[in-house]
Structure formats: structure tokens, C-alpha cells
């Protein structure tokens, strides 16, 4: 099986695939602004990110060649949060998923996850 699926935008079209992705927790990297630039989506409100979260999938938000597609990671989070009216909890889950689904060594993942938890504890 795959270690990670980049984009995975059309994965939501297949209920059997959704089940496999949920069961395996295979990370899906979603790049909202490049999807818009490349006309994968004509409107960010059609992004599968919120539904993927609601389905219990391991989705995260990424930038994809930000110099070409007009947005680094913060801009992608801002755009998708506004378009999908994501909750603070959903944003935190996306951030956590970005580290748990990364290829970082486990000790590095733990360090970054602890930092997220610390910020959340202080602010939410």
C-alpha cells in the first residue's frame, strides 16, 4: 500500500476507497490553492477537506509549489478555513495530521505535536 497519497481530491468519489483510507489512515495531502490554480476545483467551497475530516480520514493541508500557485502553507490554511468554515478543532486536526503523516522521524513528530498541543492549550 501507499505511504501517503498526494492530493487525493477524487478519493471521495469511491465509498470503498473511503473505507480503505479510513481503516489504513493513509495520509492525504490536500493543496487547496494549487487545486484552484490548476482548475481541479473551480471553487474552494467544493474542496473535499471538510468531508474527509468528517469521514475520519487522515487529511492535511499543504502548499504545492507556492511560488507558482500563489500561497505558502499559511495562505492555504487561511483559504480553506474561510471557504469551508472550518472549526478550530478541525484546523488543529489538520495541523496534527500534517506531522503524523509526514516522513519525519518519530522523535521529531512528537516534538512538533507537543508544540501544537501547547499552543492549543494556551489559546483554545
Describe each PLM feature range.
Residues 1-40:
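Active-site core of metal-dependent hydrolases
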Residues 22, 53-54:
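Anion (oxyanion) recognition and catalysis
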Residues 31, 50-53:
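A post-motif C-terminal structural segment
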Residues 32-38, 60-62, 78-83:
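Short beta-alpha connecting loops at secondary-structure transitions
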Residues 42-50:
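Charged helix-capping and loop-helix junction motifs
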Residues 57-72:
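Short acidic/histidine-rich active-site segments
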Residues 69-75, 89-91:
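Short acidic alpha-helix initiation/capping motifs at coil-to-helix transition points
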Residues 85-124:
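Mid-to-C-terminal alpha-helical segments outside catalytic/metal-binding sites
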